[in-house]
Amino acid sequence: MKIGLVSPYDWSYPGGVRDHVLHLANEFIAMGHDVRIMAPASGPKGKVIEKPVLKMGWTTPIPINGSIARIMLNPSLALRVRRVLQREHFDVIHVHEPLVPGLSQAVLRCSRTVTVGTFHTTSYPGIYSTSNLAYASAYPFLRPLFRRLNGCIAVSVTARQFVSRYFPGDYRVIPNGVNLEHFSPQVTPLPQFMDGKRNVLFVGRFEKRKGAKYLLRAIPAIREKFPQTRFLFVGEGRLRRGFQKFVERQGWQDVIFAGYVPDKDLPRYFASAHVFCSPATGGESMGVVLLEAMASGAPVVASNISGYATVVNQSADGLLTTPRNSEELAWAVKYLLEHEPLRQQFIHAGLQKAREYAWPHVAQRVMDYYCELLEEQDTSSLRHRSQAL
């Protein structure tokens, strides 16, 4: 089968949708399928512009859902997409975030084969979130595009609930996956962090909705009980400099901002963590980073938001705390550090949970859905031909 995977976001920058598309491509190729990825790409960061990626053009950064999305806005985009589709002759085109402006919408307009859309987004808290306004205000324009989809996937029940409020339909829930060969308890920790201190890890962009400031505010309460605790913050973002200045003003030691960490090195940070903490305030359709922590053997403390609650079972394989509540967050981290049997229980349960989300299983579910849609199309075509006769 020849499959075209489409990402509307800049392939040069790391992100959840990009990783999802890349893992699907790798799994499909391993199955023996022919795969191309259509995506914009604007910069040299990382090893990204290589086969099977078809670079569609440059991007423009715009704020979406409490984050920054780099998407392609180009008047010649439709012509470029049409040429690629005519050349490649895909059996299935799978568009991720199909209603995002730019490449996704252009592919929907031009596609003449079975077209699948995966919806990753949920709303950021508040009626006036960007994603809410975009869907509500652009509904008359987006509805005809949505109807061009032969099949719809949502990465979680949360994502399905959000998009179906505006675009009702039959959604297949197929989650994000986790790479168990990459994230594993067998990974060697970073030696500089294996000095007897406890390590609390945060991984994510420094944006408002990721909630890093709530972990920073929890540091004094955690250190009151466990003074020899190190805090590792992995990621980049516009708020990072302000957070670093805050730490400097407090005079805190062992609060480390590691910056951008390449994907190949990230598992060693997870392997070094005694507790993984993700205090996001919303806008998360599913907790992929939580699965990466679980697969690495790091017990999880996270915010009790709908996207995270689809991954973590409270008190069974992690602790969920009230969003924006640094006191409760500090209590949960201290409780895990203080109760080693519970920490080990969460490690064991998390490893089991991660196995349920292994990419080969997830990719096979997507492939099975493709086959269902292709069979439906063949049946429909035969019916139309028989009626014509």
Please describe what each predicted stretch is:
Residues 158, 177:
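Carbohydrate-associated surface elements
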